[in-house]
């Protein structure tokens, strides 16, 4: 699968099965929330389910630990100062860390990365992270402001 260009070799790709765009929503599917924002393809985004987002956050937490057997640092590539990218980042040089697909190609991945950051770094509970991510992403342009969230202290 050659989906992430030069990132494929030195990376682990995580793809959520999600209609992403409202026009692909199946009848009676589990997806319920649609956000608007210029960062989304066509300006509208079907939010993954809470279960999908929780599983993604748990996987990222594990992948960035020594237990995984990998050397992936918990570095949020799209985070600069207190702003997290929701779309392309300037000069996306290949480097270790956690990337959203949209940082270098396509238009997906930013919302799950935002949710995971809120869970793993801000320490929010699942439902609070979900509602906060939706509120931050709704109408956002290129970035969301995370300055009001203190990063949890390492133990």
What are these regions (language model features)?
Residues 1-2, 22:
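A short local loop/turn or secondary-structure capping micro-motif enriched for an aromatic residue
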Residues 10-23:
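Glycine-rich, acidic and aromatic/proline-enriched surface loops and short helix-turn segments
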């Amino acid at each position: 699968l050659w989906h992430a260009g030069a990132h494929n070799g030195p990376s682990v790709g995580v793809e959520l099965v999600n209609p992403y765009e409202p026009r692909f929503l199946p009848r009676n599917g589990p997806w319920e929330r649609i956000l608007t924002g210029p960062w989304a393809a066509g300006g509208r985004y079907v939010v993954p389910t809470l279960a999908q987002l929780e599983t993604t956050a748990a996987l990222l937490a594990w992948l960035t630990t020594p237990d995984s057997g990998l050397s992936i640092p918990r570095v949020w590539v799209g985070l600069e100062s207190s702003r997290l990218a929701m779309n392309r980042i300037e000069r996306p040089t290949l480097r270790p860390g956690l990337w959203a697909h949209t940082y270098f190609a396509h238009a997906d991945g930013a919302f799950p990365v935002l949710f995971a950051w809120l869970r793993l770094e801000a320490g929010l509970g699942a439902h609070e992270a979900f509602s906060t991510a939706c509120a931050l992403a709704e109408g956002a342009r290129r970035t969301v402001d995370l300055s009001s969230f203190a990063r949890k202290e390492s133990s």
